[in-house]
Regions:
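A short acidic/basic microdomain associated with nuclease active sites
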Residues: 320-338, 344-347
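Beta-sheet entry/capping signal
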Residues: 326, 343, 350-354, 410-414
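Active-site beta-strand-loop-beta-strand hairpin of nuclease catalytic cores
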Residues: 346-366
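Short acidic, S/G/P-rich loop/turn micro-motifs used as interaction or catalytic elements
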Residues: 361-362, 420-423
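Short His-Asn-centered micro-motif
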Residues: 330, 416-419
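Extended, hydrophobic alpha-helical segments in both membrane/secreted and soluble proteins
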Residues: 315, 340-344, 355
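Catalytic cores of nucleic-acid endonucleases
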Residues: 359-414
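Acidic, metal-dependent phosphodiester-chemistry machinery of nucleic-acid enzymes
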Residues: 1-309, 313, 317, 321-322, ...
């Protein structure tokens, strides 16, 4: 079964015919002009229109067209943020659909100044920014949501966790994990079916009995209000808090920075109903990434360490799905066994894949591709690459403790990250990482979840051919999957099956 056929749709957006976009700006637009164009309109008028289009054009096939590309979710997300964070009600006009089109056209006319100046490294930085802006909205809804349960509830750690101990979701989120993700499924589906809106009053309507039978209405209301919802004032405060901690981006690249809707994707106080400008942010909030940020805010590095332990075991669970592999855990070696190898060795007939796991995600400097990006990449991924080289050397030398790992076949490596570093393998970006003794690639949890479902060829042979092909240097692991047959991912399916409404019942709120 192909990956596209396995995709779960949480709701089907209504068909919507967009206004055709004439050439609104035959010139470059700077960030200040873009923000001022958005600020012409009352947020309570503009943002609900953004939500209507966000629901209608949430899927790639809907906005990957000539006359609807201006309504891509990353464009709408920035229009909504500019209105909510910088907008005002004083002396402003109501917005129309045509006004939204002009705001989106202004956004698309924003240049990349570094690229224009043809500075050294400008092309690589441009792709870093572009990937962080756009590819976040092109991930699998099924995998991102199912991974939450599969990682946090269905993966057994090998040691006692410091903060993520039994009952931690209730302490952190105020509810069980399935209720937290269930609320996201409900909000996402409602947004797509109800023009980007949700009304809390719907929870007590008779047509919601199928929903509230699984999760009580009062629980859903509490979760939505406490974990997903914010007013304009609260969103502004979140923006200011993050910028106070990470710094204010260069004005030319402000649009690539933090968006408070990623933390609180449901807006209250604009209308009689709740407004959901960008449905994709609902999924992000309920994914392991969203929970990571909540856990870090409350518990700090203790939660990060627990997540690292869980993610390492989770990667092992994914590798165990392969039918033709022997998976070996990390090896303690050296004086008093104080040194550790890579986290996993996947032994195939054709090769050995060394796997180092990093529960990390791109930070603000990487998303902005600013002067700190190279240092950040080295800090987050450099040790993982060194681990591949060190462990490969130990295998070759037959060091005590490594006897189970065959030294008679080629070795390749994977650095598996929690979240995608989309362009990290291209030569410009990978030049910031240490040299490695074996061919390797950085891949995300999502890439691995898809890789292990390949059913028409050994994954070991697939990786060996892909990573040693000089014509594919810098290609992503996901590019190696094109044209191959895929089965189901049992770990992802088990995670999804733990949620309420997994059969996707029809609920359309007040419509």
């Amino acid at each position: 079964m192909s990956r596209s056929n396995r995709r779960v749709r949480l709701g089907q957006a209504r068909q919507y015919q967009p206004l055709r976009s004439p050439l609104r700006y035959g010139r470059r637009v700077d960030d200040q002009e873009f923000v001022q164009r958005v600020r012409r309109h009352v947020p309570a008028s503009l943002v609900p229109i953004v939500a209507r289009y966000g629901a209608a054009f949430s899927e790639q096939e809907q906005y990957f067209k000539r006359h609807s590309a201006q309504y891509a979710p990353w464009v709408l997300a920035e229009v909504a943020r500019a209105s909510l964070v910088y907008g005002t009600d004083f002396n402003r006009k109501p917005a129309t659909d045509d006004d939204l089109l002009s705001c989106c056209a202004a956004y698309q006319s924003l240049p990349d100044r570094e690229l224009e100046r043809d500075e050294e490294g400008a092309v690589g930085n441009f792709f870093l920014r572009l990937a962080g802006e756009q590819l976040t909205f092109q991930q699998s809804v099924l995998n991102d949501l199912a991974r939450t349960a599969a990682l946090f509830e269905q993966t057994t750690p090998r040691k006692v966790l410091r903060t993520a101990s039994p009952g931690w979701p209730e302490r952190l989120l105020g509810c069980r994990l399935k209720e937290y993700v269930g609320a996201a499924i409900l909000l996402h589906t409602s947004a797509l079916k109800n023009a980007g809106t949700f009304d809390l009053k719907w929870l007590t309507q008779p047509n919601f009995e199928e929903v509230t039978r699984e999760v009580p209405a009062d629980v859903l209301r509490l979760v939505i209000e406490k974990q997903y919802m914010a007013t304009r004032e609260e969103l502004r405060a979140i923006q200011q808090e993050v910028e106070g901690r990470t710094g204010v981006p260069n004005r030319d690249y402000r649009r690539f920075g933090f968006n408070p809707l990623s933390r609180r994707p449901v807006v209250a106080g604009l209308a009689d109903t709740l407004v959901i400008p960008v449905p994709g942010f609902i999924v992000r909030r309920a994914s392991p990434l969203g929970i990571y940020y909540s856990g870090m805010a409350q518990w700090g590095s203790g939660f990060s360490a627990d997540l690292g332990e869980l993610f390492e075991v989770y990667v092992g669970r994914q590798l165990d799905l392969l039918p033709d592999v022997r998976v070996l855990p990390e090896i303690a070696f050296g004086r008093k066994k104080g040194a550790l190898s890579v986290d996993w060795f996947a032994v195939f007939d054709d090769c050995v894949v060394l796997v180092e796991v990093k529960s990390t995600r791109p930070t603000e400097p990487i998303r902005l591709a600013d002067g700190r990006a190279g240092e950040e990449l080295r800090r987050m991924l450099g040790h993982a690459v060194d681990q591949l080289s060190t462990s490969a050397g130990r295998v070759r030398s037959g060091e005590p403790g490594f006897e189970e790992v065959p030294s008679d076949r080629p070795m390749v490596g994977l650095v598996v990250t929690m979240e995608p570093f989309h362009t990290v393998n291209i030569p410009f970006t990978s030049s910031h990482l240490p040299q490695c003794d074996i061919p390797f690639a950085v891949c995300s949890a999502l890439d691995l979840e898809h890789l292990v479902t390949v059913s028409d060829v050994s994954v070991g042979r697939l990786l060996l051919d892909h990573l040693t092909d000089p014509n594919k240097k810098g290609w992503s692991v996901s590019s190696a999957l094109t044209g191959h047959a895929h089965g189901r991912n049992a770990v992802i399916d088990e995670g999804w099956a733990s949620y309420p409404w997994k059969e996707q019942p029809e609920f359309t709120g007040g419509v």
